[in-house]
Amino acid sequence: MNACNLILILTLFFTLSIQSSLSFEDNTTENQQHYFELTHPLVPDTDTPPSCSVNLLNHTFTNTSTNTTFTVNYTPPPTTCKWSHAVLEFQARCNSSTPMHDRVAGVWIARVELLRTSTAQPTENGSFWSVQKDVSKYSSIITTQDNSTSFSVMLETLDNENLTGVYQVNVSMHFYDHNAFRFPLSSVVGDLEGYKKNRKLTSVDDKGVGDMLGLYPYDTHADMIIPISGDEGYWFRIENESDVKKTNVSIDERTYKAVLELYISSHGEEEFWYLTPPDSYTKLNNLVAGKGKGAYREVLVTIDGKLVGTVIPTPVIFTSGINPSFWKPVVAIGAFNHPSYNIDLTPYLGLLLDDKNHSIEIQVAEGGSYWLVDANMHIWLGSSHVQAIVEYEPPSMEIENDYEFEGLEGEFEIEVERSSSAVGLVQSGLGNIITTKVTEEINFKNKLKFKEQGTRIELDQKIKRKTKVKITDASGNSIGKYEIERTYPLKITVVTQPWYGKGISTVSTTVVQERSESFSNENVILRALNHDVNCTGSMLVNGNSIMSGSAVNHQNYYYKDGFGCYSRKVNVLEGNVVADESNSICIE
Ligand SMILES: *[C@@H]1O[C@H](CO)[C@@H](O)[C@H](O)[C@H]1NC(C)=O
Ligand SMILES: *[C@@H]1O[C@H](CO)[C@@H](O)[C@H](O)[C@H]1NC(C)=O
Ligand SMILES: *[C@@H]1O[C@H](CO)[C@@H](O)[C@H](O)[C@H]1NC(C)=O
Ligand SMILES: *[C@@H]1O[C@H](CO)[C@@H](O)[C@H](O)[C@H]1NC(C)=O
Ligand SMILES: *[C@@H]1O[C@H](CO)[C@@H](O)[C@H](O)[C@H]1NC(C)=O
Ligand SMILES: *[C@@H]1O[C@H](CO)[C@@H](O)[C@H](O)[C@H]1NC(C)=O
Ligand SMILES: *[C@@H]1O[C@H](CO)[C@@H](O)[C@H](O)[C@H]1NC(C)=O
Ligand SMILES: *[C@@H]1O[C@H](CO)[C@@H](O)[C@H](O)[C@H]1NC(C)=O
Ligand SMILES: *[C@@H]1O[C@H](CO)[C@@H](O)[C@H](O)[C@H]1NC(C)=O
Ligand SMILES: *[C@@H]1O[C@H](CO)[C@@H](O)[C@H](O)[C@H]1NC(C)=O
Ligand SMILES: *[C@@H]1O[C@H](CO)[C@@H](O)[C@H](O)[C@H]1NC(C)=O
Ligand SMILES: *[C@@H]1O[C@H](CO)[C@@H](O)[C@H](O)[C@H]1NC(C)=O
């Protein structure tokens, strides 16, 4: 019985064949459940209209198992529209109550990904959600005037005879003028230069090394973005550890700064990679074979086979994850707006600046089936050829596994320490030399416990990533010093107990998750974000069906930048928002 329970949980987690027992109904808009993810306002004052808006796509995805991609010609904002900030709005409606499967979606312009998102759970009366994202940093692609540029939305799903729901998706872009009002909660710091560049991306004649100094901060807009994506322009589907996706790129020799931005999501057997016990445990206990790779995954990026950066992804819990009742109507961190990850390639420009093709390879260490990954290479151009030298040293890594188990009870601990330090020298045509040193420390700790004959699963995980960038001139004087610190703790417990009657169990669940990020310049914090989630609840489960569920979800969000602060606190009880307070008081 107990072993069965564990298998049940593993099945719940790994096969995702959860079906809802709700009925088919198509109800009016007013009754539709409105889902949302906590974030700070992207527009300071909702009364201030955008300078202009463009509706890019209206499409109804019907059978998304055969037709996952929808592509139209991209419509840029009118050239007369004055703007400094672009906000992408993705709205979706689902009219069916049956599909409990989470679907992942992405939005691309000219194969450059702008948003990775996932679907909300359907409810009896249908559901509705809207995602807004500041996409200003993609300005070079947003302003493209080439009328054959593609605009694509992909919605990937499992579909079968029982899942007849349709997704209606509308995507728009709203453009706001920075100068028209104070923009207190901009997610972009110091981007005035970026704004100037916005409108004339191909004429960079006036740019010299002066710009190289002032423009370093991460969120200034790149002059060019090169997609590192699948053949058809979309995500790479990575099936296993040896599945290496390669793209050839040849970059402009005027490049003085490059950042690779990765979009990553895990699905199928890999959706709950952080809750995976090692092979030895699953084998000895005769559990579902091949599904016990342990809880370490890392996305590796190489240039011509040389490792240049890695990402240990932050778990994103989809809307039917762990306990579906948790995520109604407030979803988990990143469910609607997946984080993307930056790898600074500036110190590695010496590997790329020779007018030749270079191979950028992406793979998932210990990865199984499947991961959806792609990348955007953001490139900043100077006015003349840049010479670059790299002192290449591969990142170092230490991994420690500590496994101990007897029968179904056990403790599995993994600790990974990854550190890298790269120094690159770039010299502009004018002879100025700038040295960029990027050091990064990644720390991953995953402690997984199976107790009480495997009926109690406890996870305690922490991911920490600290990046330092130091820029110096030819005489060794500091020009800039940036530091980014991110911490992502996650605690999950799942306790399964038999209920009266055959095959029925109660499953008690908790999820405590945090996202904490800060960005500082010369030790002054320019931007900080703190998002806490605390959910507790239980479900009554029969086989693979959830019969009923109850939940409490508390979330706190705090954001601060050079212009102001924003905080919001939301409490949800059994799917009803019982408290929702926000203010703009700064907490020291
Ligand atoms: C959802 O809407 C589509 C199109 O309007 C309709 O064909 C379909 O029957 C609806 N599905 C349900 C479950 O109501
Ligand atoms: C939802 O719509 C269906 C038919 O469209 C209707 O029969 C049903 O009563 C509605 N449900 C509720 C709870 O109003
Ligand atoms: C989407 O629908 C709206 C309202 O019907 C329409 O004004 C708009 O042109 C449509 N957009 C596209 C891209 O078809
Ligand atoms: C969706 O496509 C699949 C695969 O072609 C097919 O088996 C299924 O019947 C289709 N479902 C609907 C509702 O059309
Ligand atoms: C898939 O969608 C495209 C429009 O994006 C449509 O032209 C095509 O007929 C669809 N194919 C199938 C098999 O439904
Ligand atoms: C999309 O646009 C159409 C036409 O304007 C509208 O009828 C529909 O309600 C919109 N859907 C969503 C999800 O906003
Ligand atoms: C669906 O709509 C009906 C009618 O407004 C309402 O009574 C019912 O509670 C709604 N169901 C859900 C799950 O929100
Ligand atoms: C695209 O632009 C070219 C040149 O400006 C023009 O000839 C062509 O008709 C345009 N195509 C579309 C679909 O607007
Ligand atoms: C659809 O639902 C029926 C009844 O619950 C079930 O017997 C059948 O296996 C399901 N089909 C699929 C493809 O899941
Ligand atoms: C890994 O996945 C690729 C792509 O699906 C496949 O061709 C290859 O056979 C797989 N390798 C292993 C060892 O499973
Ligand atoms: C990349 O370039 C290499 C050598 O230049 C070539 O052999 C390879 O086929 C190219 N790969 C792709 C995917 O274009
Ligand atoms: C989470 O919330 C529960 C009550 O719902 C509380 O007992 C617990 O201490 C909270 N945990 C954290 C880490 O805040």
Spans of model-derived segments:
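Extended extracellular/luminal ectodomain segments enriched in beta-structured repeat modules
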Residues: P78-E89, I251-V259, H267-E270
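Flexible, low-complexity coil/linker segments
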Residues: D159-A258, H385-S419
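Intrinsic disorder/low-complexity detector
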Residues: C4-I7, L213, H221, S582
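C-terminal beta-rich recognition modules with glycine/proline-rich loops and embedded aromatic residues
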Residues: F412-I434, V438-E440, F450, L459
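A generic signature of intrinsically disordered, low-complexity regions enriched in glycine/proline
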Residues: L6-I9, Y195, D223, P227, ...
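Cleavable N-terminal signal peptides of Sec/SRP-targeted secreted and luminal proteins
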Residues: N2-S21
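Beta-strand-rich ligand-recognition modules
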Residues: Q19-N58, N63-F70, P76-T79, Q91-G210, ...
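Charged/polar interaction segments and conserved charged motifs
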Residues: T11, E25, K246-L262, D304
